[in-house]
Amino acid sequence: MSVQSTIKRKTAPEILARKGGEPVVMLTSYHAHTAALVDRYCDVILVGDSLGNVMHGFETTVPVTLDMMILQGRAVMRGSKEALVVVDMPFGSYEASKEQAFHSAVRIMKESLCGAVKLEGGVKMAETIRFLTERGVPVMGHIGLTPQSINTLGSFRAQGREESNWGPIEADARAVAEAGAFSVVIEAVAEPLAAKITKDIAIPTIGIGASPACDGQVLVLEDMLGLSPWAPKFVKRFGDLGPGIEAAIKDYASEVRSRAFPGPEHVYGMKKR
C-alpha cells in the first residue's frame, strides 16, 4: 500500500526555479522544535555544521562529524513539514574523493531523509558536485569564505574586497553552477562581487554577508535571535532573546531556593474517594 503525504515539501528544482524571482528565505535549525517554527516562514532550512559552534561550543566547524549531522538532520526533518531541508557535509566527509563524497551524501540522505546536501568549495569541488548530481544527490554549493578551511585561511575574513582578487571567486561560482548545483551560498564576499556573481550565473545565490542583490539570504538562527554573545558584522539581530532567557532562569533558580516553586497549582493531590 502506498502512502502519500497531504503536505508537499519544497524541492531543489523548485528552489532552482526561483532564480531572479521572489528571494529565497533560509535559516539554520538543529532541533525539532526550532525547525517547526522556522518551517512556517522559510523556504529552506539548513542543518549547518555551525551546530559545532552553537550546540557544542567548538571554536570551528572542523570537529563536526557525519553522525552529528545525520542526528540533527533527523530532528529537523521530524520538526518541519514544508521547507526543503539541506544538511551540511562536514569537514573530512567528502574531500578525499568523489566516491567518498557520494557515500557520505547517500548516508545523510537515507538516514536523515533530507532533500539535499551542501558542501564547501568551488573549482576544486566541481567534479565532486557533478558526480553527486548525476547520481541523484541535489547539491547546494558554498563559496567565498569557507569556514571548514579556517586552518588554511588563517582567519574568518571577508573575501574579494580588492577587485584584483575577484577572478578565483567568480571562477568558483561558475564551476559550481556548471557542475549542476541547484544553488550556491556566497559567504562574506564584497557586495559588488556578490551582486555581479548573482547576475552572471544561472542558479540562485544565497547570501550571508554578501549582497541584497542575491537571490536569497541565510543566517544562523541563534545569531539573528540574539542568543549568541557575539555575532559577525553581517548579522542583524531580529530579536534579543538572550537576556529574556537568562532572566527566566534567574527567576526559576530564585523560586526553587525560596521554595516558592512549585506552588499548589503545580503539584498533584490525592484522588477523592
Swiss-Prot record:
Enzyme Commission code: 2.1.2.11
Cofactor(s) needed: Mg(2+)
InterPro entries per the UniProt record, alphabetical: Pantoate_hydroxy_MeTrfase, Pyrv/PenolPyrv_kinase-like_dom, Pyrv_kinase-like_dom_sf
Localization (cell): Cytoplasm
Recorded GO CC terms: cytoplasm
Positions of the catalytic residues: E187 (proton acceptor)
Segment forming the signal sequence: none
Keywords for this protein: Cytoplasm, Magnesium, Metal-binding, Pantothenate biosynthesis, Transferase
Protein known as: 3-methyl-2-oxobutanoate hydroxymethyltransferase
Biological source species: Rhodopseudomonas palustris (strain BisA53)
